[in-house]
Amino acid sequence: MSSSCQICVFPSLAELGFSLSQLLVNESQCSDGLRLGLSGGSLVQLLCRELPKTAALNTEGWRVAFCDERLVPFSDPESTYGEYKRNLVPLGLISESQFVTIDPTLPVEKAAEDYTKKLKELFSGNDLPKFDLLILGIGPDGHTASLFPGHPLLEVTDKIVAPISDSPKPPPERVTLTLPVINAAKTVVFVATGESKATILK
């Protein structure tokens, strides 16, 4: 399978947001039911600001999962799903049933197992989920999803979703897609904004 890498630099957040929204428009047109994985953090505000004003965006048939998720109640501002839900569902842009979520009431190991089961149901017939598009952030330390530099989870190859209970960045308990799942996606976009990310990108 051939692969290519493209680096795009945008002079403003507005232009970055517009580019991401157009990517989602294009992916929606090319996919029969877009299978999308999203990250949280600053990406939530960026996408939730841009998507409602994207006229050509058709979210019908979308299924939206998360590249990682913090083990907190959905009402907590730290919940990635909670933030997307609060910003997008009331606008009618997407329905709650289109999201694939963790169960934050479970212990972190069980939450990872439960999320694995849900992803296997979404990608029936595939041992390894193959997302159409993953949109990931990058932290100042270089972490993406909840995969942190030097952490043992980087070596995990036998799981779809892994639990983490010692995240260097709070909250400590999270679940995350593993590197094999990220690498298997059709398209992966890494979004980095602000001066704090410049050093790690260089």
Label every model-predicted segment.
Residues 50-59, 82, 86, 149-158:
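A glycine- and small-aliphatic-rich helix-loop capping segment at beta-alpha/alpha-beta transitions
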Residues 134-180:
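Class I SAM-dependent methyltransferase SAM-binding "motif I" and its flanking Rossmann-like core
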Residues 1-36, 109:
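N-terminal glycine-/serine-/threonine-rich phosphate-binding loop
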Residues 112-113, 145-150, 200-202:
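A short secondary-structure junction signal
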Residues 180, 184-202:
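ATP/nucleoside-binding phosphotransfer catalytic cores, i.e., glycine-rich phosphate-binding loops
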Residues 1-4, 59-135:
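Ligand-binding beta-strand-loop-alpha-helix segment within the catalytic cores
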Residues 30-55:
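Glycine-rich N-terminal segment of FAD-binding domains in flavoprotein oxidoreductases
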Residues 38-43, 136-140, 193:
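Glycine-rich beta-strand-to-loop/alpha-helix junction loops that act as flexible
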